[in-house]
């Protein structure tokens, strides 16, 4: 990508002479600027573009030629007076070219007039220089008493039919190359200074003339750089180890969460399988206190048999409400077995009068009026003297197979 930039440079001596001539004249003044235009191509290599060429033009204003009579080399229409123009520039050297012209105006603004534009176009055609510049200087009073004036100046250059301002730099006021520090010092001829330096030279300088402190600081800087590299490598290793540990911790957390879910699911199943049917256990103890076989049987709420016998008193508040009243259709086989055994018992009443019942008979407790109304659909479950423990367990197993949670 190619670009152009233009900068004008004027020495402090030339600029001071221009302002001196302007301030000592009673009217507007004008003249020509002499100097040279230099071009320099600057090639910058960037990441986006391999070649970035920029052309820098420097307008060096070296001298000015004043015109002591206003409008001497042109008329009111802006047409040039060629003979007067040649007389004005006759004594100049050939090495110094006309690079522009200037004009001082009192109490006006920094705007080119229409006549100045026409005159500038005619001067471009006469000198065959399309890069001709125009320096406009104006002065305005800065106070009401007009004791202080403000001087403004601008350098104009035509481009594409328009006049653009060109930066003007005064060399002894804004040139950075002349304001820089000197890196080399001149020879010192002072005898006293040489004596003082020789006396303390070994404390501050080495044998080769270099500053000792500078070398020490450079050595310390190199040592610090090496330590910094080591620390950076250790930091990278520690960061990598921390990342690995964090990944391992996250994996362990996931495994723990999965195990917790599995344990909760298993715990729910185990609790259903191992939780004892307390009401059934208390019912066996209350209604069959002398049957060790029934009291040794334990069933869970899910209907599964628990291998260990229960030896704990549950002390449930619902035990007092337990009865042996069950619905008739719950024990059809037990009802038929009991009816047949009652008939056999009536026939052999005399023979079995001496037999003792293993389980004491229990009569049905008195109930409310509501229980008496439903007595047709319920019956009393009791044992006779001829029933054995096997018969009782068989009857209970039939019921358990049909209903895993019997109602008492």
Curated annotation (Swiss-Prot):
MPN domain residues: 7-155
GO-annotated biological processes: attachment of spindle microtubules to kinetochore; chromatin organization; double-strand break repair; mitotic G2 DNA damage checkpoint signaling; mitotic spindle assembly; positive regulation of DNA repair; protein K63-linked deubiquitination; response to ionizing radiation
Record keywords: Chromatin regulator, Coiled coil, DNA damage, DNA repair, Nucleus, Phosphoprotein
GO molecular function annotations of the record: microtubule binding; polyubiquitin modification-dependent protein binding
PTM comment, free text: Phosphorylation of Ser-405 of the pSXXF motif by ATM or ATR constitutes a specific recognition motif for the BRCT domain of BRCA1.
Keyword flag Hydrolase: no
Xref: Pfam families: MPN_2A_DUB_like
Location of this chain's protein in the cell: Nucleus
Biased composition (Basic residues): 337-358
Any coiled-coil regions, as ranges: 210-272
Disordered as annotated region, ranges: 335-408
Record PTM Phosphoserine, positions in chain: 405
Motif (pSXXF motif): 405-408
Biased composition (Polar residues): 394-408
Family (UniProt): Belongs to the FAM175 family. Abraxas subfamily.
Assembly: Component of the BRCA1-A complex. Component of the BRISC complex. Homodimer. Interacts directly (when phosphorylated at Ser-405) with brca1. The phosphorylated homodimer can interact directly with two brca1 chains, giving rise to a heterotetramer.
Protein name: BRCA1-A complex subunit Abraxas 1
Annotated organism of origin: Xenopus laevis
Gene: abraxas1
